[in-house]
């Protein structure tokens, strides 16, 4: 799959005779994250992964990262701030293993493995959120080790952010500066990056998340997905009673342009 897979699954495929290198469909941006994780691991940095702990891509990235270095997953800025408290010593190291249960690599040593870190992400997370987490943790390291060069404790991984996802997010943010009546977002209902675009639009406009043109039933009715509740909803009179109507349309990073 585009988001890659875990080393355990790769090994199972090899055991049954499937030559995975001949069928490699992993997104190059995901592989770039893996390669950078391996590179900074060789320099004795631990890997902080910004992602949804149960998402397939995050699980794959965690598997590859943990094979080379101590690794931990943070799902958002709130978790990053809690992780920072273990760096600064504000929290008892023993509590880490409960607070971040199932989100850290085997043998993770809180006192040792948070001295040198680098941040990578699930490529479909908001790039701005990942950058904010990286900037925050970098400042924590600077404050914690004021007499050292920042690079001694924090690896620069900015160039691992996926430009396809980042470009979409930046374009949508710019688009939302335009006065409009509603937004339609097209993409897969299980797509993480598309759901982030929906979130951006929902902050400003009535937003309808659809996966194909057939969901627009008429000028009056639209079937759309509520990704918060995982329900499909039918909305009547979704178009305002005015003319002209200004509609913002965007789509997820992997959505075919023809849609």
Q: Which residues fall in each region the model found?
A:
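The feature marks the mature, well-folded catalytic cores of soluble enzymes
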Residues: 1-259
């Amino acid at each position: 799959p585009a988001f890659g897979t875990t080393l355990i699954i790769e090994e199972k495929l090899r055991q049954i005779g499937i030559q995975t290198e001949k069928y490699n469909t992993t997104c190059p941006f995901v592989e770039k994250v893996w390669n950078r994780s391996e590179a900074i691991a060789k320099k004795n940095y631990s890997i902080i992964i910004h992602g949804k702990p149960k998402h397939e891509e995050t699980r794959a990235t965690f598997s590859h990262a943990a094979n080379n270095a101590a690794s931990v997953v943070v799902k958002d800025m709130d978790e990053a701030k809690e992780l920072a408290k273990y760096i600064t010593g504000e929290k008892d190291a023993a509590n880490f293993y409960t607070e971040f249960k199932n989100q850290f690599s085997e043998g993770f040593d809180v006192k040792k493995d948070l001295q040198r870190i680098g941040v990578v992400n699930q490529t479909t997370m908001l790039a701005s959120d990942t950058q904010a987490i990286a900037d925050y943790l970098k400042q924590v390291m600077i404050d914690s080790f004021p007499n050292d060069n920042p690079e001694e404790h924090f690896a620069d991984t900015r160039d691992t952010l996926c430009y396809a996802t980042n470009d979409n997010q930046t374009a949508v943010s710019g688009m939302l500066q335009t006065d409009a009546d509603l937004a339609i977002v097209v993409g897969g209902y299980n797509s993480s990056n598309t759901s982030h675009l929906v979130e951006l639009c929902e902050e400003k406009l009535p937003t309808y998340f659809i996966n194909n043109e057939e969901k627009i039933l008429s000028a009056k009715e639209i079937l759309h997905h509520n990704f918060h509740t995982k329900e499909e909803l039918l909305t009547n009179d979704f178009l305002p009673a005015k003319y002209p109507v200004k509609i913002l349309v965007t789509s997820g990073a992997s959505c075919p342009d023809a849609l």
